[in-house]
Swiss-Prot record:
A single Gene Ontology CC term: small-subunit processome
Source organism, top-level taxon: Eukaryota
Compartments in which it is found: Nucleus, Nucleolus
GO molecular function: rRNA binding; U3 snoRNA binding
Bias kind Basic and acidic residues: ranges: 18-27, 100-120
Subunit record text: Component of the ribosomal small subunit (SSU) processome composed of at least 40 protein subunits and snoRNA U3.
Role according to the record: DEAD-box RNA helicase-like protein required for pre-18S rRNA processing, specifically at sites A0, A1, and A2.
Family recorded in the similarity comment: Belongs to the UTP25 family.
Keyword hit for Ribonucleoprotein: yes
InterPro entries, per the entry: P-loop_NTPase, UTP25, UTP25_C, UTP25_NTPase-like
Name of this protein: U3 small nucleolar RNA-associated protein 25
Sorted UniProt keywords: Nucleus, Ribonucleoprotein, Ribosome biogenesis, rRNA processing
Compositional bias of kind Basic residues: 1-17, 89-99
Amino acid sequence: MAVKGAHARRGPPRRKLPKFETSRVQDLDQDNSPSEGPDAFDNESLDEASDAEYSVVSSDSAEEERLTAKPYNALLQLLNVGADPNGPARKKRKLKHKNKDNGKEDQVDKVKRSIPREVDSELQDDLDVKEASDDESESGDENDGIDEADRDAAAGSDPFEAHFSQPDEARLSKRIEASTKTWQTSKHQLSSGMRITATYPYAGNEQSLALPPLHSLKDLPLKRKLSETASEHMSQINAQNSSIAPYIFGYYDMLYGARTTENAASLRDMYCLHALNHIIKTRDRVVKNNSRVPKEGEDVEMRDQGFTRPKVLILLPTRQACVRVVDSISKFYRADQQENKKRFLETFSETDDKSWEDKPEDFQELFGGNDDDMFRLGLKFTRKTMKYFTQFYNSDIILASPLGLRTAMEKEDGKKQEYDFLSSIELVVVDHADALLMQNWDHVEYVFSHLNLQPKAAHGCDFSRVRTWYLDGNAKYLRQTLIFTSFMSPEINSVYSTYAQNVSGKVKINTTYQGAILDLPVPVPVKQTFSRFDSLSPVKDPETRFKYFTNTVLSSLAKNWSGSGKSSASGTLIFIPSYLDFVRIRNYLATSSQTTNLSFGAISEYTSVRDVARARSYFMNGRHSVLLYTERLHHFRRYKIRGVKRVIMYGVPDNPLFYGEIVAFLGLDPSAVGEAAEKGVRALFSKWDALKLERVVGTKRIGSMMMEKGGDTFTFT
């Protein structure tokens, strides 16, 4: 199946659409560097690579290794002539002895029978690589002595042990059952002004998710290897992060809606430290259990693994964002060697464009450096090495854009899907979710819908070591989901509500808004009018909004239109959040008898740079009386439109920063700023716009504007 939303550089995918000719004008004349390691797969742009090079489980270098390894594989086959062909590929000693717990043995057999043992040649190549890697020293700290995390585990206070490693099965079963029926909700506010909505599955006993803040790294259950490096780079936890640290390190789901350019780095450090701590503890448990077998005998019960190796998935908007995350990971994880780091920097990192110095800070953070949104990367950690570009099935952490990951999961013909590497993900991080919202949110939903599904193939799994809640199909109830966004939206809330099912509970953290209307970058007061219309449901909202706009807003403007097009309606910018609404309004202006005398231009995220420049010039010079302008175009370009004397917002923007930037267009012409301020801004809204409107008018005002029955027009200056 073809994936919609092809990658782009600082902009959306440009489709070759039929040119729209009906706008009226007045009568005036990467470096495709070779793989540097046997585990690498090609992460270059699709414009430079074929689908085969984007295989999750194979690459050019992996193919070379497979060819050179054939004699060794043949020797292994000769040595295994007498082996049981129906047994698992590795660690067969467990199956030679009858399990003391017959129920669990039956459970293992049931899952094994449901997974086909046949795998294709490419997948077998990946298993060969995995076999070789097992001889390495993994990221275990068995020689480091007993650290704080070990003492916490022994004392039963380590969240990792309580949540993943050794959960109370009876309590877990009750919570899973409760999660499908009843959730309890509580709300409280922090001294910093942050609002927390906590939800947990009600299993017959009250639970408080109002956790005390963590001010010191000593309060975190970190492995000693990480505690030392964390103390160097995070000497203390700031006041804002101290309130959310207990939920991150305590394995609660969290939707954090107050991400900014100022706190982005500290939030990134926190979730990277947490992800590393989880990876190291997971691998330590496996390594230590491996050493227990010779001492305690082969009948010892050890449940310490998932179906596949990857445990952490981090979704990011751009390659440069991936570089920042990897930098954060590498400063906490001191590796003696970093394989393929040079290739990583060459293909993922770029310098900032100096011409963007006048752009807003949030724009520079998102689009600075390499802004390609088509990428994926596997990271593997051993005791002394950090490896880049490892194959997914041999990786501990997967970093990817939603588009890049989806193209790895499905083929264009739609016949083959590969998502088993997501079957054992225990921590999902979505950073800068609001930026992903401006790309193609459908890719995010697609990835979440394929998390923690039962794998279609064994992939060398030792089922005798798989945790019981994996075998029961309950991994999604223990997976931790962390979403960081600059603002909330219905789409983000939907993913959080649908896929965040952590039995420990989940918290939604939002800030209190003063309102974008109070901080406008205009030298004079601007008249701001908000018009409410009644809408019965979200499904009917687009139709209701369109009728209100054409019958009320356009009709009032039409009175000022003349045959020449020069009227008091000139200089009108119509800001439209949705591209679908943009197309509908553009077509209406081009064909309606109501707008016969109107000259207008229309620019969107799919308009060519040349056509955008022409439309802006015509609008500034008065040849266009009206200019249609989409939110996504503003997100990707941040134009400063000149000639604006009136702003009509078909809907308020998702990003509150955009409101101030759009209103600032009124002050770009000093000679006409007084007239523009008087005409001001008119924004349409319904009750379904509550989240967006709160950020624009402020938390204190939103209630009265939604519930006011005495009128539907609200004016601020």
